[in-house]
A protein has these predicted regions:
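A short, flexible loop at the N-terminus of ABC-type nucleotide-binding domains that lies
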Residues: 1-5, 9-21, 70-71
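Helix-to-loop junction immediately C-terminal to a conserved catalytic motif
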Residues: 50
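Conserved ABC transporter NBD signature motif
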Residues: 58-69, 73-74
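Conserved ABC ATPase "signature" region
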Residues: 98, 102, 109-127
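Conserved ABC ATPase signature
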Residues: 131-135
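Conserved catalytic motifs of ABC-family nucleotide-binding domains
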Residues: 152
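Catalytic Walker B motif of ABC-type/P-loop ATPase nucleotide-binding domains
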Residues: 156-159
């Protein structure tokens, strides 16, 4: 399944242009790293993809069909993990996953099986019943990603998922994401401003001041930079 962004632009005002004529195509079963400094337009792009704001111009297509923002169905094919935590720290990991599954309309039996599957995949058995507020940063990130996958999305979009993690947990997170691509068959867009995380992706998109400055395989970037 293909997810295409075509000539996307977004202006917050006449003087503030967050994204300028951005186009790319994402394929499932791949991890695409989106790299850019703070202010490059990455977070604005994620808000548009999540349906939180509308682009000023341009289109988003899924399998060649333009995404009508009045149709909520495409959002059901995407899982989002935002930079700022949105998980309930007072409730247990199990309760958070259960609530997310209920919002997605999963029946009790399917939800129970899915939670067990995700707990095993993310190795969360030792802490899944504890209040989220008592967990480490790495444990919370695993839980947030698991929650985004509760409904088996085709796409997983991650906005700065390694924020606040040390190098060991960053490496573990990268391993988990690649495992998910193989086991779940989903496509991943990994947004980051940390160059060390570039190798987490199969492909690379680079943004600067709202514009795309590179889109391709890492080997191509090395040739351009050499």
């Amino acid at each position: 399944m293909k997810f295409a962004v075509k000539n996307l632009s977004h202006n917050y005002s006449k003087k503030v242009r967050a994204i300028r004529n951005f186009s790319t195509e994402l394929n499932s079963h791949k991890v695409t790293a989106l790299l850019g400094p703070n202010g490059a337009g990455k977070s604005t792009l994620f808000k548009i993809l999540a349906g939180l704001i509308r682009q000023t111009s341009g289109s988003i297509e899924i399998n060649g069909t333009s995404w009508d923002r009045n149709d909520p169905e495409p959002l059901g094919k995407i899982g989002f993990v935002f930079q700022d935590p949105t998980i309930d720290g007072m409730r247990s990991g199990t309760a958070n996953l259960t609530y997310a599954g209920q919002l997605q309309g999963l029946d009790n039996n399917s939800l129970k099986n899915r939670i067990e599957e995700l707990v095993a995949t993310f190795d969360m058995g030792d802490y899944i019943t504890r209040p989220v507020g008592s967990l480490s940063g790495g444990q919370r990130r695993r839980l947030e990603i698991a929650r985004a996958l509760i409904h088996r999305p085709i796409w997983l979009f991650l906005d700065e998922p390694s924020t606040g993690l040390d190098i060991d947990n960053r490496l573990k997170l990268s391993e988990i994401i690649h495992l998910l691509v193989n086991s779940e068959g989903c496509g991943v867009l990994w947004c980051t401003h940390i160059p060390d995380e570039l190798r987490s992706g199969d492909n690379l998109i680079m943004m600067k001041e709202g514009e795309k400055i590179f889109d391709g395989h890492f080997d191509s970037l090395e040739q351009v930079m050499s």
